[in-house]
Amino acid sequence: MHLTTREFFIDGIKRDRWVWSGDAIQSYLMNYYLFFDSESVKRTIWLLRGKDPVTSHSNTIMDYTFYWFLSVYDYYLYSGDRQFVNQLYPRMQTMMDYVLGRTNKNGMVEGMSGDWVFVDWADGYLDKKGELSFEQVLFCRSLETMALCADLVGDKDGQQKYEKLASALKAKLEPTFWNNQKQAFVHNCVDGRQSDAVTRYANMFSVFFDYLNADKQQAIKQSVLLNDEILKITTPYMRFYELEALC
């Protein structure tokens, strides 16, 4: 952490030396435990947001935009710094407006021109077409985060708006992606049809976000998390979340 902390939290001291939103949110968590360097967290969050008008996702990566939203409320939970949320909230609103302006007819996000739908590096093929279950889970959590932050700053209309959007999206997750035969969320849907692929990403996030009932969480543990036939996670970055789900 010492090596990757400058004015901001950077990734890859020997390689990228760049600020990536997905890596930063994990750096923040390690920092809260090790140093509690709040100023570096705030500077990095501001940097990753950038200026208005919004013209692209954070680092151009769809999932990294969602991690950015989550990182703001994480910071509040650890610091109690409501003033920071007040300062940042207008930028959160315009960032979410950008995301909402790119949803499809189902209210879900898909990769569009200029978007990098990343998810993770993998040793196998990861289809990025259509509605990815992983992206919808992160999107839903981001909307819930917006509602929480709206409440913190006293924006009651915004709170109701984001709660309604989050509830509507959450209600679509299981009907759209859950496959009873596979006992898991499928990786994606293309043109309204579930793919045959099952990956770990949406399944493990839905577990630690508590989006599924206890029976389905246990089903995911057996059919996905402890199943060696499911594409394995190879990066420490995503392994972090897999271990969180197992915990």
Would you name each region that the model predicts?
Residues M1-F9:
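Mature extracytoplasmic enzyme cores
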Residues I13-R15:
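Glycine/proline-enriched, intrinsically flexible loops and inter-domain linkers
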Residues W20-C247:
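Active-site core of glycosidic bond-cleaving carbohydrate-active enzymes
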